[in-house]
Amino acid sequence: LRCLVGSEMCIRDSLIMAHNNWKILEKLLILLDDKRNDIYLHIDLKSDFIDFSSKVHNANLFIFHEIDVRWGDISLIQVEFFLFKTAYCKGNYSYYHLISGSDLPLKTQDEIHAFFDAHYPTEFIGFSLGMTCDNRINKVYIFPKYQRIKNRYGNKVLCLLRSFCVFLQNLLNYNHYKLQDKLMIGPEWVSITEQSVSLILSKEKIIMKQYRFASCGDEVYKQTIIGNS
């Protein structure tokens, strides 16, 4: 589950992605229910649609049930772009908070708003400096939608096929990533300004092309775009 919470200088925008843990999601929405917040919630298309509108009375809540999201697949990036773009079109948010439906705020809304108002326009995005992610993006991972399937034996077969395919690409020195940007990795959850969201959206076409066969590219593309800007 992913959620985007947005705000207009004093109104925040929350983008949420969700697929289960409905009780936690319900609690999250209640804690975010503040007139200064706009909440954009995407529920995985594989999951049953649940209307949480009755749980939110002060914030503006927008619920979407559009994309079949698969672990490690380009669909994770697609749903993030969907949320960023939908919120950006409304515009005038000082911060876009991309969070999981399993997250809960540890501070009150007054404390959270005061913190981000005091630190604007700082970008809050994590970088795992000791990790390398080149092989995640440089190589083509076959059957990216099926990196985690319920059939244990099928998982093993697909894992072996992917490993063999990557081995051949290494042998042939094949590099799928054609951009000059240095690849960077970090957590997918961020709190970023409208300026950064605009920059990310301007790269949509090339990101969808370059990350189509990547593994867990959602942990790479935002850090790479912002880190190289």
Predicted region positions:
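Single conserved hydrophobic/aromatic residue that forms the stacking wall/gate
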Residues: 1-11
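Active-site beta-to-alpha loop of glycosyltransferases that engages the nucleotide-sugar donor
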Residues: 16-24
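Short, acidic, metal-binding catalytic loop of nucleotide-sugar glycosyltransferases
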Residues: 27-38
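Short beta-strand/loop segment that forms part of the nucleotide-sugar
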Residues: 37-48, 65-66
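Active-site-proximal specificity loops/subdomain of glycosyltransferases
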Residues: 56-93
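Short aromatic/hydrophobic "clamp" motif used to bind/position activated sugar donors
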Residues: 96
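Conserved donor-nucleotide/metal-binding helix-loop-beta segment in metal-dependent transferases, i.e.
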Residues: 106-141
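Catalytic core and acceptor-binding pocket of nucleotide-sugar-dependent glycosyltransferases
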Residues: 159-229
